[in-house]
């Protein structure tokens, strides 16, 4: 089994991803500064340090990671890391504003903000570390620094079959670890320094009002009272996904089912029926499918897929390209990418991916159950996992609807959702635990949960918006 990509396509793709990362960072920075003023400005500085350090590590700049190289999934991980790195700063800034609204002094509000925000930051980052470790351990190489760390634990997964997933996991792990340095420690040092610098010792610079207090309003949405509406919507969404599966079926990439997939760039118009006959005759295959599209550089592409055990040799690929350019000289066919996967290896990779997902779910469940053992334990962990499975199922439905083949990148996306979406749940659980200690039996459980969700609503919306901005920019720039 092997996979190749055209150097020109790889270079153009790299340029596009770098542009997307820069644009995403600028937009997130503007939003943070406008929303949080001085803490937002400091957050941008810490994010710059985090992004630069992550780029240095994943590029192999530090000799302790000699095998590290910058890849497209790695850049995607850095861009996602920008969105995720905002989380720690948003939690802290929101808590500072909330404490200012209680008419605390600026220094008292800052100290309380850091103290109350640290626990959910740690819990959220630990879940990402769990996911990153599974991505690296299950899909990583069999030698090198990280192999020595993970192979004794993940030896039962067997040898690596997807280096791109490992690269994505390595970038996630690097981003999270550096987030502790820049998003927690560096931000804390800079904000506390600003508090003790007289020209900046003004509450309005930290989200408060000049006359005192802060514009911090807690919503009063009755989430528990409207839970039946949410249940109905979720059930309807799941039903729609199941209908999509029945109508369209689930499309598997060659990574899972085995076979060959060749992507060719070309110019002008192409007759698919005629091309299928020509390619089938040249390869001596009849069970092939053709699909047109475009690559990240905007070139027209033709994707040829041969399922099962019908893998191709390098000689066959060269002969095919020569035959196409001889018969269709005006189209100027150029090989972009080739993936050859043995059917047995494809099935093994599928099983490995499912096991990795299950392992991530179990580990996150156990961690959440332990951390929140005073407010439900296993019930809290199980509920969190059910919500995550719901999110992953919706993403699965989008792949089915858009006819996007399921492959290693899909598994990486699901594992990322596992680690990232749990952050919102962790923050809410942390609030429930805090409010339970404050109010105890003074409030019923539904009232306690409603209050906690509403108090966390602003933070959840802000982190979701920043992450969506980062990911949307990648999509838009890739299309343009």
Regions found by a protein language model. Give the residues of each.
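A structural signal for conserved, well-ordered secondary-structure elements
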Residues: 1-480
């Amino acid at each position: 089994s092997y996979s190749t990509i055209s150097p020109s396509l790889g270079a153009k793709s790299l340029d596009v991803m770098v542009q997307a990362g820069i644009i995403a960072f600028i937009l997130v920075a503007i939003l943070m500064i406008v929303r949080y003023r001085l803490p937002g400005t400091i957050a941008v500085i810490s994010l710059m340090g985090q992004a630069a350090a992550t780029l240095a590590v994943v590029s192999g700049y530090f000799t302790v990671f000699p095998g590290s190289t910058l890849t497209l999934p790695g850049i995607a991980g850095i861009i996602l890391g920008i969105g995720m790195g905002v989380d720690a700063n948003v939690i802290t800034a929101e808590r500072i504003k909330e404490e200012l609204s209680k008419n605390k002094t600026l220094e008292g509000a800052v100290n309380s903000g850091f103290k109350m925000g640290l626990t959910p930051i740690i819990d959220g980052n630990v879940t990402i570390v769990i996911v990153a470790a599974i991505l690296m351990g299950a899909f990583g190489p069999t030698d090198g620094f990280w192999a020595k760390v993970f192979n004794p634990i993940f030896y039962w997964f067997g040898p690596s079959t997807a280096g791109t997933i490992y690269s994505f996991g390595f970038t996630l792990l690097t981003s999270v670890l550096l987030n502790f340095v820049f998003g927690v420690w560096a931000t804390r040092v800079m904000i506390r320094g600003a508090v003790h610098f007289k020209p900046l010792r003004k509450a309005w610079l930290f989200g408060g009002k000049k006359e005192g207090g802060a514009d911090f309003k807690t919503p009063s949405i009755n989430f528990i009272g409207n839970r039946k509406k949410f249940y109905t919507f979720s059930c309807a969404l799941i039903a729609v996904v199941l209908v999509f599966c029945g109508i369209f079926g689930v499309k598997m990439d060659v990574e899972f089912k085995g076979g060959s997939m060749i992507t060719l760039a070309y110019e002008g118009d192409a007759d698919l029926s005629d091309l299928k006959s020509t390619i089938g005759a040249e390869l001596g295959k009849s069970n092939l499918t053709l699909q047109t599209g475009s690559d990240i550089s905007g070139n027209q592409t033709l994707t040829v897929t041969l399922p099962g055990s019908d893998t191709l040799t390098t000689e066959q690929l060269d002969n095919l390209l020569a035959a196409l350019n001889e018969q269709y000289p005006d189209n100027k066919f150029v090989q972009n990418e080739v993936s050859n996967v043995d059917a047995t290896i494809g099935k093994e990779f599928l099983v490995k991916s499912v096991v990795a997902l299950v392992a991530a779910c179990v580990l996150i469940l156990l961690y959440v159950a332990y951390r929140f053992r005073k407010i439900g334990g296993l019930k809290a962990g199980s509920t969190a996992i059910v919500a995550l499975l719901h999110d992953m199922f919706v993403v699965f439905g989008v792949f089915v609807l858009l006819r996007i083949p399921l492959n290693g990148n899909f598994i990486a996306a699901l594992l990322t959702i596992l680690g990232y979406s749990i952050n919102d749940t962790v923050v809410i659980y942390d609030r429930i635990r805090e409010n339970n200690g404050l109010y105890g039996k003074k409030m019923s459980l539904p009232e306690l949960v409603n209050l906690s969700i509403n108090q966390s609503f602003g933070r959840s919306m802000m982190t979701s918006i920043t992450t969506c901005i980062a990911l949307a920019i990648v999509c838009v720039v890739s299309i343009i």
